[in-house]
């Protein structure tokens, strides 16, 4: 890169759904010669994960207000003011050319501080319905991007940046044609697991018997109980049941169909991998995960089953209906919905906003 090295400040924290897409964009721009720093909080996952990725991180003191008591609500303006002051000092010291907000509590004070310092703000909303912080920041942002249509009325749809090993998987027609034997069902509840999946899928295994084979990620601490549930269902040694899957790309490559929650990053990875899915949205009051999954259901690539209706019989009926030609057609539709160059699209908008 000729001339002055461009500087980016990424604001993202709290959960992997915010941090991992931010890391993907950061690495892409670093490979082009950009200098990148991170704004986060010291008590969330970004504090350890970001430095492991070779990126320096600065911290401000901020936390969420949802579900907090009256005293926390009353002192919120003081805490937000203090966090904005902290963020302004960091911005003035680092002097970024542009700031990228990927979500989490840190984005609010960070985005406001950048705006007050005259630094352009680019926002990326990962979910199908915008969070409170991004709805507010959208008023002062130079550019607003969204992963799924509908979060903002006029924002560009750019997808969610996903891991390169998932993007490198063979296309469904290369991967799935010629497969025989039981339908391969990958069950993912996220790294924390999902109790409804852990309770229901052993019964699905018992109902469908040799029609399916399951690879089930149960989440931290749930392995003994889920193994016992498979044992009691007469399915003890017939399926692969693990606490955590380290290589998700390998799991996607193995699978014919996925049963999972519909967090933003999960939905984007399933689409990029080209896999049919049964999505079970987390019962959040704004139905965020339902809106994430809806584009894939509308495309004929997935089925949404709300948690109260997620029974062994309902899941068994669906899986029994889906033969291999149907699954291949759904997989190809999933891949059509995917935006495989999301990282490049977000990075290009960041670069454009910095000029």
UniProtKB/Swiss-Prot annotation:
Known EC number: 2.4.1.227
Gene Ontology CC entries for this record: plasma membrane
GO biological process: carbohydrate metabolic process; cell division; cell wall organization; lipid glycosylation; peptidoglycan biosynthetic process; regulation of cell shape
Pfam families per record: Glyco_tran_28_C (PF04101), Glyco_transf_28 (PF03033)
UniProt KW Cell inner membrane keyword: yes
Location(s) in or outside the cell: Cell inner membrane
UniProt binding sites for UDP-N-acetyl-alpha-D-glucosamine: 15-17, 127, 163, 191, 245, 264-269, 289
GO MF annotations in UniProt: UDP-N-acetyl-D-glucosamine:N-acetylmuramoyl-L-alanyl-D-glutamyl-meso-2,6-diaminopimelyl-D-alanyl-D-alanine-diphosphoundecaprenol 4-beta-N-acetylglucosaminlytransferase activity; undecaprenyldiphospho-muramoylpentapeptide beta-N-acetylglucosaminyltransferase activity
Membrane spanning stretches: none
Keyword terms: Cell cycle, Cell division, Cell inner membrane, Cell membrane, Cell shape, Cell wall biogenesis/degradation, Glycosyltransferase, Membrane, Peptidoglycan synthesis, Transferase
Annotated disulfide bonds: none
Membrane topology value: Peripheral membrane protein
Pathway listed: Cell wall biogenesis; peptidoglycan biosynthesis
Reactions it catalyzes: di-trans,octa-cis-undecaprenyl diphospho-N-acetyl-alpha-D-muramoyl-L-alanyl-D-glutamyl-meso-2,6-diaminopimeloyl-D-alanyl-D-alanine + UDP-N-acetyl-alpha-D-glucosamine = di-trans,octa-cis-undecaprenyl diphospho-[N-acetyl-alpha-D-glucosaminyl-(1->4)]-N-acetyl-alpha-D-muramoyl-L-alanyl-D-glutamyl-meso-2,6-diaminopimeloyl-D-alanyl-D-alanine + UDP + H(+)
Signal peptide residue numbers: none
Family, as annotated: Belongs to the glycosyltransferase 28 family. MurG subfamily.
Listed NCBIfam families: murG
PANTHER family reported for this sequence: GLYCOSYLTRANSFERASE (PTHR21015:SF22), UDP-N-ACETYLGLUCOSAMINE--N-ACETYLMURAMYL-(PENTAPEPTIDE) PYROPHOSPHORYL-UNDECAPRENOL N-ACETYLGLUCOSAMINE TRANSFERASE 1 (PTHR21015)
Function noted in UniProt: Cell wall formation. Catalyzes the transfer of a GlcNAc subunit on undecaprenyl-pyrophosphoryl-MurNAc-pentapeptide (lipid intermediate I) to form undecaprenyl-pyrophosphoryl-MurNAc-(pentapeptide)GlcNAc (lipid intermediate II).
Listed name of the protein: UDP-N-acetylglucosamine--N-acetylmuramyl-(pentapeptide) pyrophosphoryl-undecaprenol N-acetylglucosamine transferase
Organism lineage string: Bacteria, Pseudomonadati, Pseudomonadota, Gammaproteobacteria, Enterobacterales
Name of the coding gene: murG
